[in-house]
Amino acid sequence: MTRKALTITLFALLALAPAGPAVGEMVLSQVIVDLLPGKPPRDDIEVWNDGDERIYVSAEPFEIRAPGTPAETRAPAGTPEESGLLVAPQRLILEPGERRTIRIALIGERPPSDRVFRVAIKPVAGPVSASTDALKVFVGYDTLVLVRPEGPTSEIEGQRAGRTLTLRNTGNTAQELFDGRQCDASGADCRALPAKRLYPGATWKQILPFDAEVTYRSSIGPETRERRF
C-alpha cells in the first residue's frame, strides 16, 4: 500500500473557557487576553506539550471587524505595523514536556473603541513516520484578544417589548453579561438567564420567561456592576 498521511485540523472555539484548557497534547495557560487600560499593553500565553511526541505549533492572528453584529468579518491581521498587534513567535517546536510562551502585545496607541482579534494557536503537521496510512487529528484554540480603549465607557441600553428583551452596547468596549435572573410576580419561581459578551454596537435579543424585572451583572475586566432592565 502506498504510504500517505491524512491530516485533519479541528478548531475548538474556547474563548469562554477557563484558564488551563487541554486538548489532546497541547495545553494553553489562557484563552482570553484582555489588554485593559492602566495595565501593561502585553500579556503572554504559555503553550505546553503534555504529550510524548514533538509537536509543531503555529500562532496566526486575525482581526475581527464589527464583532457580534451581522456585518462581522474575520481577516488576517497582517504585520504588526499594519495591525498594531504583535504575536511572537508565530512558529514553535515543542519537545515532550516543554513549555514556551507566545507574547501578545499592543503596538502604538490605544484605539478609541475596542479592537478585537483572534489568534489561532494550533498544532500543525510535522513528519509522518507511520509505515501505513496515517490519520493525524489536531485540535487548536481560537484565542480571543481584546484591545481596550484608554477611556472605556460602559453604557448598555435595554428595551422591553412584551417578553422580548433587547440589549444594545452603546459604549466603546465589550462587556460580559452574566448571572442573569428573572422571577415571576410572586418571587417563588426564579430562572437563570443566558450569559453573553456584548461588543460595542452589538445588539442582543432574548425571550424572557416572565414579565417582571430582569437583573444582570456586567463586567469590564475585573470591575462588575448590577444592571436592571
Named regions from a protein language model:
Residues 27, 50-98:
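Surface-exposed binding patches on compact interaction domains or structured appendages
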Residues 38-44, 98-100, 114-118, 161-163:
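Short, solvent-exposed loop/turn segments enriched in Ser/Thr/Gly
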Residues 23-52, 91, 150-160, 195-198:
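Beta-sheet-dominated interaction scaffolds and their linkers
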Residues 47-51, 165-173:
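Asparagine-centered strand-capping/turn motif at beta-strand->loop junctions
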Residues 77-110, 188-213:
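Intrinsically disordered, low-complexity Pro/Gly/Ser/Thr-rich segments with frequent PxxP/GP/PP motifs
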